[in-house]
């Protein structure tokens, strides 16, 4: 049983009503409920009295160091079996981290801890790592995004990785680790028997100089399945240094996120070698890189190779034009693996979308999700899209948000959505404007077809 309350300011009467439930439910989530330290004594008593509790989430509440301390005291009892604890954005600072080592030692059942958006800093992280290294601590997943960490924190973290073979997920995104810190972290990973599965280092000040270190990590960690290096200035040189590790048989990576990494078509050449060779790679994001049409051509050639089994490709905001769409048409008609294509925020226009629609109208296409938001599609382009909705049997989600169409274009889509042969399940139309009459028709259709969601 779960108690899941979000974005509700809890009155005294409502709080009195909830306290007995907090003492009973296995999962308790009270996110963004306006809780402060004042309520934490009650929470502490309630969780202490609840031996069934396996998950507690108090994210986005101003608990402060005192409030967090009270909650953790309540969890430290012999009957507590909690497995997942989220204290994201709760105002935990260095001053409140002194309780963490004892908490981690006593909660041997705890497997997942979220401390994102707490300004604990390097000193707080050091205290946390003292607890993580204790033999009684069995934590497997740790999230520390936006925690004011620097390179100083990387040595304690590396020490944890060296001794914790069961550690599976580490999120350090949006911390100023920079080149020295990432090098220390990578060395710790290479030296350890840690079976890490997911490493997220978005916006950590990584440069091309770190990519040889990261190459060694992906080469040595067969357990690693997800790597996020988004919003780091890797450049083409960094991608060239990373890819040899990705090509090795020991690398089993499934998901690679490279948003906004200063990659151009030149960098695509190295990535294309990986796509052709690695059947394990299923998700690739290259959003917000200046790939342009030449980069799209190179990617599509690789997607057609038998060795490529990619299922999801994100190329949002990559300066693609209608000239790139014939390349994707070949992929859409021939690929048996690509299920999701995110092309939003590229000026494809009606010409490009009409080209894509020719391919999507062919029998036996397998694409399930297509994102074309902010692609300069007008009412004219909706005619081709409406035909796709009738002809295509695989497409389940279509995003057309923030395009130049209006009521007439939406009505064309609506006519296709009414037909029994249309199998679409979700249509997203944010920031598109139509009359009240069109709105009434859309909502009436949703009532007639409960399996269809129209989000606007």
Curated annotation (Swiss-Prot):
A Pfam family that this protein carries is LRR_RI_capping
Q: What is this protein called?
A: Ribonuclease inhibitor
| Repeat positions for LRR | 15-43, 44-71, 72-100, 101-128, 129-157, 158-185, 186-214, 215-242, 243-271, 272-299, 300-328, 329-356, 357-385, 386-413, 414-442
Q: Name one GO molecular function term.
A: ribonuclease inhibitor activity
Its keywords, alphabetically, are: Acetylation, Cytoplasm, Leucine-rich repeat, Nucleus, Phosphoprotein, Repeat
As recorded in Swiss-Prot or TrEMBL, the protein's gene is named: Rnh1
The subunit structure is: Forms high-affinity heterodimers with RNASE1, ANG and RNASE2.
Q: Which SMART domains would you find in this protein's record?
A: LRR_RI
Q: Per the record, what about its domains? A: The LRR domain forms a horseshoe-shaped structure that interacts tightly with target RNases via a large protein interaction surface on its interior side.
Q: Which GO terms describe its biological process?
A: regulation of angiogenesis; tRNA stabilization
Question: Would you tell me the Gene Ontology cellular component terms?
Answer: angiogenin-PRI complex; cytoplasm; cytosol; nucleoplasm; nucleus
The N-acetylmethionine modification is found at: 1
Q: SUPFAM superfamilies of this UniProt entry?
A: RNI-like
State its location(s).
Answer: Cytoplasm; Nucleus
Role according to the record: Ribonuclease inhibitor which inhibits RNASE1, RNASE2 and angiogenin (ANG). May play a role in redox homeostasis. Required to inhibit the cytotoxic tRNA ribonuclease activity of ANG in the cytoplasm in absence of stress. Relocates to the nucleus in response to stress, relieving inhibition of ANG in the cytoplasm, and inhibiting the angiogenic activity of ANG in the nucleus.
Entry annotated with the keyword Nucleus: yes
Residues recorded as bearing Phosphoserine in the entry: 86
